[in-house]
Each structure stands twice: as C-alpha cells, then as structure tokens.
Amino acid sequence: MKLRNAIIIGVIYTPSICQAVEQTNYKYYSDHISINQDSSTIVKPNEINPKQAEILIAPKNSKGISHNKYDTFDVTDAGIILNNKEVAAETIINEVVNGATSFLAGNIAVAGNAAHVVIANPNGIECHNCSFSNTLQETLTTGKPVINNNNDELIGYRLEKAIAPINKGYRGGKSIEHIGKIVFSNKNDRSSSHSFNKLNIISNNIKLENGFISSKGDINIYSGKRDIIIKEGESILKQEYAMRSNIKRNNLPNQIILGDKNGDPKKQGLISSKNIIINASDTTIYNYGSLESSNRSKNAIQLNLNKTTFNNHGYILARGGYLDLQNKSFFYNMESGTIGMQYWLNTGKNNNNYSETYIGLIPKNTISQMKNLTLDISEDSKLINNGVINTERLYTRDKNMNNIQNNREDIKIYTKLRKIK
C-alpha cells in the first residue's frame, strides 16, 4: 500500500519537478545572462547555435513595451537573440537591476518584428565592437527607465549623479570612474556597414576609447542631467525615486571623452548619415576624433551646451553645424581643431566610403567650407578659436561677434555673416 501511494505521488509530482528544473536552467545561461527573479523573461540556448543565448522576452504592456529585468546581461562574440516573434513589442527594455557592468562584444539581434532596443545598466555598459540588427533604434543608458504607471508610456531615464559605497559595482573593486559609465572600444573601420540604426547614448560619463561609433541614423548623446525626459509634457516624480539622504554618496564625473588623446583623429570618432546631436549640461567634453555627418541639414551636427566646456582637438565635419552655448558654456577649438566640411560632399557623393580616401590623404587645410554654421551664444558664454574654422555662411545673434574670439589672424572664419532668424 505504501509503495502504491509512493508511485502515485511520484507520478503526480514528477512534471512539477521537471518544470522547476527546466525553469532553473532557462533562468541562467552560460554565466552571461541571468534573469531577475521578478521578471517573466526566459533565456535558453538557441536551437540552431547552442552557443548563442535566445531570450524569450516578457509580454508587452498597452504601449507595446516589453520590460525585461536581469541580474547579469553580457553578450559574447556569439551574440544573442531577442525573440520578438510572439510578443511583437515595439520597445524591448533590457534593464540590469542588480548586477555589474554589462559587456557587449557581439551582435544583439531582434527576431520577429523590428523594435527599439534599450540596454539600461546603472553600473555601466562597455561596447567592444558590439552591434545591433533588425532594430528601429538603440538606446544605451546608465539610467533607470521610468514608465508612467497610469498610461504605460516610457517617460525617460533617471541618472545617478552620485553613488553609495554599498553599490554592488563599487564593492566589486571598480574605481568610481568606471561606475555609471558607457565605454565604446571599436575597430577603426570606416566602412559603410553601420553598427547602429539610430543610436541614443544616455549617461553622465561617456568614453570612446578607440575606433568609430557608426550609425546610418541619428546619434543622440545626453549627459549632465539627472532626469532625461523623452516624452514631452511628462516629469519624473522626485519623491518616487528619492535617494536615501542618510547614506554618504560619492559624486560621479560628468564627462564625455571622444577618442584617445594620443590616437589618430582620423581613425576614431562618430560617423552618421543623419545628424549628430550632443545635449550636455554641467559637463566637460573632449573631442580627439572626427565627428562627421553626411546629412544635408543645416543642423547636421548640433551641440546644445549648458554650463558645459567643449574642447575640440579633432574634426567637426558636416554641411551644417549648430552650436548652442548657454549659461557660461565655453567652446575651445584647439590648435589641432578643425571645423569644416568633407570635401567629397561637394562632389554630390554621399557614400561614407569616399571619406576613407578623404580623411586618410587630404590635409586638414584643404577641407571644404562648411555651408552653414550657426553660433547661438549667450552673453556669458564664448567660443575661442585657435585652430581652423571654415564656413561659407556664419549665423550669429544680430550678426554679433563679441562672444567669438578668433586667435588665428591668418584664418577668416566665414565668407558671409548672417543674422539668426
């Protein structure tokens, strides 16, 4: 009788045991992806390539957002797949809520409907030749995604401006300079195959160590603010994400470093077929590379600086540029700094492959004139030029040059001076 009961109990409970084992295996994959216990996300080996993790994303909310939470999110050179075939989400958030820096060394591919992919990790993200495929746009952020509980919309991101010693990344032995930081280390390949479709970088500490960040769409950079709002008319409630004031916190640096200062500016930087837009507040920026846009827009490269210092040691090249300097902001075009336009844009050829020949062989003093350069400078801000600025039309407030200090007497900055309308 006892044996019969034991068999019956075994039959009843065997499926449950198997299911538990299966879930445990799927919740943890090859030391690289571990799902947070509060997330319904599942990870498993890809059937075609077992070395590749396949993530079955969480169900979407009413606004098409699939919010996936992890303790670890790393991508090897084998890449990962975000399976969106069943969910059909418009936005796939991958948030690390309790883990160390995310290392992205492979391709992050969306299977099924293309989607906006967000990687969010307050302890930092390092992209080592990482790339994305079948994405509408990509967001890398050290901020916490904030979703409106009333209407399910993604409002924006909250960035930490300080960190407590109890932080897991801090305890792990990393210096404070590495916490809350986004780092890119890529090849110096200028090919037309872009790693990103439309890239958003949101962090108060950003560094391009070497190589290029290349996008066929816009490159948007946000730095210096605690709250980055992407939905107009919304606000992030301070009390909802209030920090504990009784814990001593160490301030994180607000800085953007584009390129290695000892590297070749022709072999590192940002390349976009659309616009490059940097929005920075209370930040120090160093450009040692080449910022290049092949877009026809008058604002193809746009720098919106508030209480920020921009040190340009490299190239800023486009048909049109817009520098908005406000609230004691300073733009220093250093002796090695050059602002102009790629010569090959005058040929009517918009393929970035032409820039390989251009940037490698043509000296900087033969760079073409930028078509339009707008300098919207507040009274307490200033542009100081010790390098090369070459534009056909220069737009300023009331044709005023008081906030522009040109220390190069041999350089005429513009051909025509115009008033900002």
Locate the predicted segments by residue.
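Classical Sec-dependent N-terminal signal peptides that target proteins to the secretory pathway
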Residues: 1-23
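Short, charged helix-to-loop "capping" segments that act as catalytic/coupling loops
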Residues: 110-113, 295-299
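Short, solvent-exposed linear patches
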Residues: 195, 217, 297, 319-321
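Beta-strand-rich extracellular passenger or scaffold domains
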Residues: 64-70, 91-94, 102-105, 124-127, ...
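Solvent-exposed adhesion/ligand-recognition segments of exported proteins
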Residues: 3, 20-274, 280-281
